[in-house]
């Protein structure tokens, strides 16, 4: 059974006019390596820690500024949200299609809330806590191309023509602000699009971005702004002592107009200085150490890296399944070809390297979790190839071969072909990222040993489910297994309304 909404009734939960307050018993374990009777052994000790959560239930008017607004992802997301808001339908060769949010965790997935008369009861994910309605978002942003959003949508060739015709009147007046362009960080083939750029030194560019954010917020009368990078993949920035390793050095390098500060890092610095959440949707190392330090000092949310939408999402499920089943993956070979502008930019070796790193690290935690299958330091062979094939456009092809060792030296091979509609998969992920980032800023919590409430760590691990290479606080383990990432996000939000984590034991039926 599916229900649209619910309210928790419990002595541990209190709803007021402005907030939801919950008391939550967090059950975990601690391990001790101790000497007992002359021999060291591991002892696991269950423990319970009491937490309190409070969530501000005032849903703000939200502005979303996309870096690369006129790209495939930005134009597709903007058109999709408007189409949903206006209730637009359009004819395809198969049927009359209604606008929807399929592919969005917050808008199109469900959670289990319990059982009733022997039947499982589910509710929308978005019913857990008050979230921004996507159709009330005000969109804006920057682009190095001056093309309006209607023409950008046509250039992208993602949406059906009948839908594009209906969307044009809503989008032709939407024009991105000039963007920061540095040809040293992206492929040379992107130069032909760069007719709409912010001039000046890096510090002047930073100041212009800050000015743009302030003016957007004032003009549109929004309460909050979230900025997300959905522009070209950049090459990796060199992390150098004295350049960007500390906040002080990073800001000094900015004053000196150092060449190694990337455009994405400039946008992120601007957001942190304005206390505006910034999310990196591409694989480059935007968050250099000095920037992470700045975000932590100013308690400003940052998240990333790289949208997890197609091939990598499948990989994080399949490898988790294989290792969890006691099967040993020994080789993972991933081949991609795509024909959109992302593919053209990735045809340059330096930008491809950023994507290769992002895609290659996705299985590390799963391999490291099983010391029966893998010796220390042992790892499957893992190769990632990406090629630019203009003919396929936004319909990225992903082909994977997984070779595994099974019982008694046997071999198992799984071959998968995945046609990933690149922007149609990424757009709802962008939506989820900005909605969850905004929600995160309204939640505070404390443990029984702390004296006051505080926000989550500025490095937003709650967004890991949506990120190919999750950004985590220094010293924090990286989790890539998709089921664990989703469970973490859902269970934290459940705790905010006093619900136990979903453990799937269902003892009442055993």
Curated annotation (Swiss-Prot):
Pfam families: Inos-1-P_synth, NAD_binding_5. It catalyses: D-glucose 6-phosphate = 1D-myo-inositol 3-phosphate. Its cofactor is NAD(+). The keyword Cell membrane does not apply. Pathway: Polyol metabolism; myo-inositol biosynthesis; myo-inositol from D-glucose 6-phosphate: step 1/2. InterPro entries: Myo-inos-1-P_Synthase, Myo-inos-1-P_Synthase_GAPDH, NAD(P)-bd_dom_sf. It comes from the Eukaryota. Expressed in siliques, leaves, roots, seed endosperm, but not in embryos. Highest expression in roots. Confined to vascular tissue and hydathodes of leaves. GO terms for cellular component: cytoplasm. Keywords: Cytoplasm, Inositol biosynthesis, Isomerase, Lipid biosynthesis, Lipid metabolism, NAD, Phospholipid biosynthesis, Phospholipid metabolism. Its main location: cytoplasm. Its EC number is 5.5.1.4. It is found in: Cytoplasm. Coiled coil: none annotated. GO terms for biological process: embryo development ending in seed dormancy; inositol biosynthetic process; phospholipid biosynthetic process. Disruption phenotype: Lethal when homozygous. GO terms for molecular function: inositol-3-phosphate synthase activity. Belongs to the myo-inositol 1-phosphate synthase family. Key enzyme in myo-inositol biosynthesis pathway that catalyzes the conversion of glucose 6-phosphate to 1-myo-inositol 1-phosphate in a NAD-dependent manner. This is Probable inositol 3-phosphate synthase isozyme 3. It comes from Arabidopsis thaliana.
